[in-house]
Design a protein with these regions (language model features):
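Lectin-like carbohydrate-binding module/patch detector with strong preference for beta-trefoil
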Residues: 1-200, 209-227, 252-269
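Glycine-centered loop/turn motifs
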Residues: 5-7, 243-246
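Extended, charge-biased low-complexity segments
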Residues: 212, 241-244
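Chromatin/DNA-recognition segments of nuclear transcriptional regulators
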Residues: 223-241
Length: 269
């Protein structure tokens, strides 16, 4: 567990095929991809102290949702979910040392299975899948290289507004503005419907709603579940074909709360 530091970001690279564990461009998918220079490949470390020990949880730097494993129709699936309960073994992992250098094995607390890269690699898309394995077979498919991601020195620029043809889906956005110390009042949550996926458009609308003169002063943070940690929203919203809920906490630039936010420098060498 010494390679995982609370609040920091990491890449997880499969020893078997060299691909990185990534959050897909949808709401819940997880896969292996070659490109690590993306928020989708960065994972924030959330250490939970539980029963006298430490539990590892990982949430995506893209949309804040947590790496989870759950049982469905007799098999275990890996995906991202909102953290609405603590403690929850669905989201809990333990990093074990492997037989090879500093590589780690990630063992899921609830199933006691290991996170593994599915051995096949799609040569066309240069991607792969992930799943769980019941036992340590000593193969590289279960070994993960933990690469620390340094923080950025400045807030990343939001993507350009999407074209009208890219505006799909609708979100039920619950939003609240935090005070300068990052504290939010539970009674101040408000709701509006947002059409599309553009984070820049969403930022501009929330700045207007909250009376913030410059949209760049409104730092949008997504909260994936009641117990989810705040994740700065720097990518466009996931594709969706249904009405989805989205919790947004707005942090004001220049405040102590803004200074505590950490952005992974995914372009670092």
């Amino acid at each position: 567990m010494e390679q995982f530091h609370d609040g920091h970001h990491v890449w997880l690279r499969s020893r078997a095929n060299g691909l990185y564990l990534c959050a897909d461009d949808d709401r819940s998918g997880v896969s292996l991809q070659q490109d690590r220079a993306s928020a989708h490949a960065a994972w924030a470390v959330h250490i939970l102290h539980f029963n006298g020990g430490d539990v590892l949880m990982l949430h995506s730097a893209a949309n804040g949702r947590y790496l989870a494993a759950y049982r469905a129709e007799g098999s275990w699936n890996v995906e991202r979910r909102d953290l609405n309960r603590l403690p929850s073994l669905t989201f809990s992992w333990y990093a074990l040392g492997s037989r090879y250098g500093d590589d780690v094995l990630l063992r899921h607390f609830k199933s006691m299975f290991f996170l593994r890269a599915l051995f096949r690699r799609d040569r066309i898309s240069n991607s792969g899948g992930v799943g769980l394995c019941a036992m340590d077979r000593g193969t590289t498919t279960m070994q993960w290289v933990v690469e620390a991601i340094p923080p950025r020195e400045s807030v990343p620029t939001l993507p350009d507004p999407l074209s009208p043809s890219s505006l799909s889906g609708v979100y039920r956005v619950w939003y609240v503005r935090a005070n300068p110390d990052g504290i939010i009042c539970p009674n101040n949550w408000r709701l509006f419907l947002f059409y599309g996926r553009s984070v820049r458009n969403l930022s501009a609308l929330l700045a207007i709603e909250l009376g913030i003169r410059r949209p760049s002063d409104a730092i949008l943070c997504v909260r994936a579940g009641f117990f989810g940690r705040l994740t700065p929203l720097v990518t466009n919203l996931p594709h969706n074909n249904m009405l989805l809920n989205l919790d947004i906490v707005v942090i004001t630039a220049g405040t102590s709360a803004a200074d505590r936010l950490r952005y992974p420098n995914v372009d670092a060498a």
